[in-house]
Regions:
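Accessory RNA 3′-end/elbow-binding domains used by RNA modification enzymes
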Residues: 50-53, 111, 115, 133-205
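RNA pseudouridine synthases
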Residues: 1-156
Length: 205
């Protein structure tokens, strides 16, 4: 977003997200992803695919999730990763999140590739670690791609090469919010002077 569009960015980023991730079983790290320090290992033995599917299905719906200690969430005015880097102990609060759907795309040895649709604020790293624990293994997220944010899909995005070459389309605010309900205000002075607007739209406007 650029110029005036930055004022409405919060309404777009608050929508649901979709990711394609890979869970690696047998090794856990302090960051919950492949960039961290290994803290536990366990020899992997093949699991029954039906057992894996049943485990994943248990994570669909609303739940309390504990974020990774290496995250930007603030506790007492300080980011969690700052506590971690300083070697300080801190209680990591859980958050209410919702997993709308989970689809296993591929199972290959200790690697499970899956697609997940979830609410804003869901940590896929934590989801991977929690699923691994349910399956009886330490685990971490070894790969992550955000495939969709709200109505914006990755296949509709422009690459850096496209942008550098000038081959891209900049969405207008109207295009970006075309999937939102709209309320037309006849007199803009009503808004300017802060007058209450009556509407039968009870959600996003």
């Amino acid at each position: 977003c650029v110029n005036k569009a930055t004022k409405v960015l919060q309404f777009l980023t608050s929508e649901s997200k979709e990711y394609v991730a890979t869970l690696s079983l047998g090794t856990s790290t302090d960051t919950y992803d492949a960039s961290g320090k290994i803290i536990e290992t366990k020899e992997f033995h093949a699991l029954d695919n039906n057992e894996i599917v049943a485990c994943f299905n248990n994570f669909i719906g609303s739940q309390e999730q504990k974020p990774p200690i290496y995250s930007a969430i603030k506790v007492n005015g300080k980011k969690l990763y700052e506590y971690a880097r300083a070697g300080e102990q801190v209680e990591v609060p859980t958050r209410s999140v919702t997993v709308n759907h989970l689809e296993i795309l591929q199972i290959e040895n200790n690697l499970i590739k899956f697609k997940v649709g979830c609410s804003k604020g869901t940590y896929i790293r934590s989801l991977c670690v929690d699923i691994a624990k349910k399956l009886g293994y330490p685990g971490h997220m070894s790969k992550l791609i955000r495939s969709q944010s709200g109505h914006f899909r990755i296949e509709d995005c422009s690459t850096l090469e496209d942008i550098e070459a000038g081959h891209f389309h900049m969405l207008s605010i109207e295009e970006a919010f075309e999937h939102f309900d709209k309320y037309v205000i006849e007199d803009e002075n009503i808004v300017i002077h802060g007058k209450m607007i009556k509407s039968d739209i009870d959600h996003q406007v």
